[in-house]
A protein has these predicted regions:
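ATP-binding pocket architecture of kinase catalytic cores
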Residues: 480-675
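Active-site activation/catalytic loop segments of kinase-like enzymes and analogous catalytic loops
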Residues: 785-824, 842-862
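Active-site acidic catalytic loop and adjacent metal/ATP-binding pocket
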Residues: 482-496, 606, 644, 698-788
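ATP-dependent phospho-/nucleotidyl transfer catalytic cores
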Residues: 622-631, 658-733
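Intrinsically disordered, low-complexity domain-flanking/linker segments in eukaryotic proteins
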Residues: 359-361, 365-381, 546-598, 657-664, ...
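Juxta-kinase regulatory segment immediately upstream of eukaryotic protein kinase catalytic domains
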Residues: 457-480
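ATP/Mg2+ or Mg2+-diphosphate-binding catalytic cores
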Residues: 846-890
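N-terminal accessory scaffold of Fe(II)-dependent oxygenases
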Residues: 2-281, 291-458, 463
Length: 890
């Protein structure tokens, strides 16, 4: 019992328990007391005040060593053998030529004039910011925040083996005055991420406070950025390894799935070491491994940055695949399928810093042994490579971008590959970043082009653009037009007044059906004379781009008939090969039911050229519009969405039966693909919701299956009163992607403000605030409520006034069928017909994380205990509209 008591009182155990809970942190003198208090498991005067029990005769060397590490002092540690150079008054040219991208350096006199030198003492910080909460760095995924005065109290009381420390990237928001106390040193003022808006750019600056024994374990800075760190108080001990030499005992995880090769390094090389003193700034180049240990209580500020020296490395790290990521960090150990046998019998040594000319000997990947400032092979260890192809057998590791780019996985493409979660910014943000750099920094276009080729394969897609342009006699792109635009899922170029979109997302089968369905949709619009044609782009050309024998060629196609090129490269087995639009809507529905995934990348891509629409993308101008303007826009959207949902479906072909056993024979064929998809997601609903990474409260995940109908066909099938016959609703065309970046808004100059005139009819409304809807590549059929989800959550941002204005001009019932009277009668007694319930079900089962938008817009719903609460707050207005909405004549 005594042993169990001792082990159960271990502080790391209680610390882990507390950190798993998260929240606001107030230290009670020990982690056990702090955790029990946080969980309300003891009163202030009971367990917390009891004296610790002592047991004679119990010994544990393991626990003693831990205890020793918790109470040891480092303040007298002053060893520094000068591995890292110290320099004062470096010019920018000297820094760039001698150190930037080459090796670390300690810099003095950069912070002499900072107010922080005097204002960032612990006493003054507590006086000025004691009540401000800061983020705490720790291993738990839970967020820990703490008032500064409470953290200082923790520092004074704690004896943790690995103490918590403040590592806050949001300090500029919680304590903006801190930003005025320092300025970025002149050597590091170039940061190519600064073309992004603050909300778009990755975390880049941190305010750091840590006690003795705290610090950061071995790591490479995110995205292969470089960093500077200025110490204001205390002393820090740094250890560093150059790129490709993994510290002993460190395992690098780089998986093929998320880009993040398990590599256990055999190296026992001694690192570069230095002690950083108050007022000194250390520069850590891109790709360098480093760890930090606080010898005293320290206060520091650090920033990561992208400049011309590391730009290509940052872009390379964003490229799809994992091999190059591993090589950048672990050297040739990361080459897949290669084994490395360490040749030992060499004494351990140190790395010496020779920044100007790293010799081939020093660049060679080494194991147990020394790297000395010498060219003698006899002084260095080496590796023998077993089963290595001849091209790598005698390779010498280099951090040069030409060497590293050899390890890119050529078959992977930016637009068709999974984006690594370890990348510092998102996939779409990366394209936006490169585009902004291209426009705003024309003097760097040579460098930016190289980076874009690495990150997003821009050379490949530009070659595609050139072939399409030549085929259709389009003007040549200007220098400003050479990079893709927009944040969509496919490469899009704007050349003069033309928009060229190359469909790459989802593989050839998916993209070919997307193009075929879009062309069929346009054909239907013209046949029925829909007014929607005035609010969508005009198609100029379409077809397929084929790559064979090292050359691109185009095959024009208008959607009608099966192109020979598909039969050669992708022999689709289609039920509609002889129909007018063989890759149209019904073929797309069948393709979706088959669930067939692309087995490999094929050298063929559909494309479409449209006339560039006049107007501004709504996402870019929404913040400049008045509420009245937004109401007019919502009303215009209602009119155009009505036009989309009223468009008749193509002539129905006989659809093969889906494999989903939950899809009944009696279900209408046009609904079977929708029902099959919804049932498939419902059957894995907990896993589906868990994929959103903590977005959805756990209590709601547990209740999702109970909330959803047992059969998803219940959302479109109702029982008519009287004889009990089933009544089915009609599906509608669904745009599927009505987001703020797919809406263009245009002011009428002669009308002045959008609010100057009250519209009296549809014509006046369109003249007042004309909108255009773009990107119909995700067209499908289904419940028209599905289009309302992105509209309300993304375009309207949950604004109920905009939703009501939209519904006021939409003027269509949500449920339509052969007999709207029968539909109206049958829904009176059906829970599943309630508009708010159906909308909530579609949100839960959505293939995008729309629930993140809901819990972001209505933060109070993070504490909801039932889906009904969420449904009523977000979607209740739909029920009032449904009860009063007009019915169309049968």
């Amino acid at each position: 019992c005594s042993v169990m008591y001792i082990l159960c009182n271990e502080e790391p155990l209680w610390m882990s328990k507390y950190l798993s809970v998260g929240g606001h942190f107030e230290y009670k003198g020990s982690w056990k007391k702090t955790t029990l208090s946080r969980l309300n498991l003891c009163s202030e005067n009971s367990e917390l005040e009891q004296k610790a029990r002592h047991f004679d005769g119990f010994n544990s060397l393991y626990l003693y060593r831990r205890w020793y590490r918790c109470f040891t002092t480092l303040s007298s540690y002053s060893f520094d053998n000068g591995h890292v150079e110290r320099k004062d008054d470096l010019s920018l040219d000297h820094f760039r030529s001698q150190y930037d991208g080459k090796g670390p350096v300690l810099l003095g006199k950069l912070a002499e004039s900072w107010p922080a030198r005097t204002k960032w003492s612990m006493q003054q910080l507590v006086h000025d910011y004691g009540e401000v909460t800061f983020r705490i760095s720790q291993r738990s995924p839970k967020k820990i925040i703490m008032k500064l005065k409470d953290y200082v109290s923790y520092m004074e009381l704690q004896h943790d083996e690995d103490p918590l420390y403040i590592f806050d990237d949001k300090f500029g928001e919680s304590a903006p005055a801190l930003l005025e106390d320092y300025r970025v040193p002149h050597l590091f003022q170039e940061d190519l991420f600064d073309v992004l808006d603050y909300e778009q750019r990755p975390a880049f600056r941190w305010f750091i406070i840590g006690p003795e024994r705290s610090g950061a374990s071995w790591h490479v800075d995110p995205g292969l950025t470089s960093a500077w760190n200025t110490l204001l108080c205390g002393r820090k001990r740094w250890a560093l390894y150059p790129p490709g030499r993994v510290p002993g005992g460190v395992t690098v995880h780089v998986s093929a799935e998320d880009g993040d090769v398990d590599i256990e390094t055999p190296t026992s090389l001694q690192p570069l070491e230095c002690t950083q003193l108050p007022g000194e700034t250390i520069f850590v180049p891109s790709g360098w491994w480093h760890c930090v240990l606080n010898l005293e209580t320290t206060v520091a500020v650090t920033q990561n940055f992208v400049n011309q020296s590391n730009f290509e490395h940052v872009c390379l790290d964003m490229a799809p695949g994992h091999c190059h990521k591993g090589v950048c960090r672990a050297g040739l150990l990361a080459v897949p399928g290669k084994s490395v046998r360490d040749i030992e019998n060499h004494p351990p040594g140190t790395i010496t810093s020779n920044h100007n000319d790293m010799t081939c000997t020093e660049e060679r990947l080494k194991g147990s042994g020394s790297v000395r400032d010498s060219n003698s092979e006899s002084q260095c260890s080496s590796f023998e490579f077993s089963d290595v192809d001849k091209s790598l057998e005698n390779q010498v590791f280099s951090y040069d971008i030409g060497f590293l780019s050899q390890f890119l996985e050529k078959e992977k493409d930016h637009y068709t590959s999974v984006w690594s979660p370890t990348n510092p910014i998102g996939q779409r943000e990366a394209r936006e970043w490169l585009r902004r750099l291209w426009v705003l920094k024309p003097e760097l276009r040579g460098l930016i082009w190289k980076g874009a080729c690495l990150a997003i394969n821009v050379d490949k897609w530009y070659a595609c653009l050139e072939e399409i342009r030549a085929c259709h006699s389009l003007p040549a792109p200007s220098e400003d037009e050479k990079l893709p635009v927009g944040t969509g899922s496919n490469p899009v170029f704007i050349v003069s007044d033309n928009v060229i979109k190359i469909n790459a997302e989802g593989g050839l089968g998916y993209s070919a059906h997307g193009l075929g369905t879009e062309l069929e949709f346009y054909d239907l619009l013209r046949k029925v004379g829909s007014p929607l044609v005035n609010h969508i782009p005009e198609i100029i050309a379409s077809g397929f781009l084929v790559y064979e024998d090292g050359v691109y060629r185009t095959v024009p196609w208008n959607g009608k008939g099966m192109p020979d090129v598909l039969a050669k490269y992708y022999p689709l087995e289609l039920s509609y090969a002889n129909s007018c639009f063989p890759l149209g809507l019904w073929s797309k529905q069948q393709f979706g039911m088959d669930g067939s995934a692309e087995s490999s990348n094929r050298p063929i891509w559909p494309y479409m050229v449209t006339r560039k629409c006049k107007g501004d993308i709504f996402a870019h101008v929404r913040d400049t519009l008045s509420k009245a303007d937004l109401l007019n826009l919502a009303s215009s959207l209602g009119v155009q969405m009505r036009n989309i949902h009223l468009l008749p479906l193509p002539h129905e072909e006989s659809l093969p039966e889906p494999e989903d056993n939950n899809v009944k024979d009696s279900d209408p064929p046009e609904w079977k693909q929708v029902i099959s998809t919804l049932n498939r997601r419902k059957n894995n609903i907990k896993k589906h919701l868990a994929n959103w990474g903590g977005t959805v409260p756990t209590v709601l995940i547990e209740k999702a299956e109970e909330y959803l109908p047992p059969d998803m066909s219940s959302l479109i099938k109702f029982v008519k009163d009287g004889d009990g016959d089933s009544v089915y609703t009609f599906p509608s065309w669904i745009h599927s992607d009505i987001m703020d970046d797919n809406i263009l808004t245009q002011r009428a100059p002669e009308m002045g403000s959008l609010t100057d005139t009250k519209s009296t009819g549809d014509g006046d409304l369109e003249k007042l605030n004309e909108i255009l809807i773009i990107d119909f590549s995700d067209l499908s059929i289904g419940d028209p409520l599905c289009d309302l989800i992105p509209l309300h959550l993304d375009v309207f941002r949950g604004d109920i006034d905009l939703l009501r204005e939209y519904l006021g001009s939409y003027q269509l019932p949500f449920l339509r069928g052969k007999s709207n009277d029968d539909i109206y009668k049958s829904v009176q007694n059906s829970k599943f017909s309630t508009a708010s319930y159906r909308a909530m079900c579609y949100c839960i089962l959505h293939d995008d994380n729309v629930l993140a938008a809901i819990f972001g817009l209505w933060k109070e719903l993070r504490n909801a205990t039932s889906w009904e609460e969420v449904e009523h707050l977000v979607w209740d207005d739909l029920n009032r509209y449904q009860q009063s909405s007009p019915t169309l004549s049968s």
